[in-house]
Swiss-Prot record:
This is Uridylate kinase. It catalyses: UMP + ATP = UDP + ADP. The gene is pyrH. Pathway: Pyrimidine metabolism; CTP biosynthesis via de novo pathway; UDP from UMP (UMPK route): step 1/1. ATP binds at residues 18-21, 60, 64, 173, 176. The keyword Zinc does not apply. It comes from Corynebacterium glutamicum (strain ATCC 13032 / DSM 20300 / JCM 1318 / BCRC 11384 / CCUG 27702 / LMG 3730 / NBRC 12168 / NCIMB 10025 / NRRL B-2784 / 534). It is found in: Cytoplasm.
Amino acid sequence: MTTSSEQPRTGYKRVMLKLGGEMFGGGKVGVDPDVVDNVARQIAEVAKTGAEIAVVIGGGNFFRGAELQQRGMDRARSDYMGMLGTVMNCLALQDFLGQHGVECRVQTAINMAQVAEPYLPLRAERHLEKGRVVIFGAGMGMPYFSTDTTAAQRALEIGCDVLLMAKAVDGVYSDDPRTNPDAELFTEITPKEVIEKGLKVADATAFSLCMDNKMPILVFNLLTEGNIARAISGERIGTLVES
């Protein structure tokens, strides 16, 4: 475990950026245009430098399948509602990226040809090579799989160098920093140490996919201006989870 080290990090060429849907809503139901515009601007600035950026967005600002299930809804049906929510977020981000001069394609795991391409990994890779941002919507297209898991699976299939987990905190802590002021921020940690310490990085399925396939995970604070660029360039921000 490393909590403070000056060992340099390398930058990344192709990245998967996982964004929580709650952030798009600014704490409310729906899409906050100012928030989405800010995220789009940061992504556009980095994309114009030659970085290849794929994005997965949650749908928590519209629906959360697990929460709807607790209120008596069928889990599969409520998960599909959540998937549709992610597509609305994808289209919003696509529009704002276009306003910032970046070409973008949305690919969805559920066929909806009038608004997006179907998920085709080889086509997604070609888009990235041509400098387009690719946003993956509708989760895995199947219930019981989170958007964290989608981000991990897509990152592996299209050959990303790292999974960037954008959060509202600075990284992975030894305890909840909101309730424990003495909580320690890890700058580097191994997957084994994450498990031993019971730390929360991503959901269990997503974390296992990354650990088994040696995909690094970088957890960082999206609310700090310029952090997407810093994360991709290799600056020492957030927490790097790597074997």
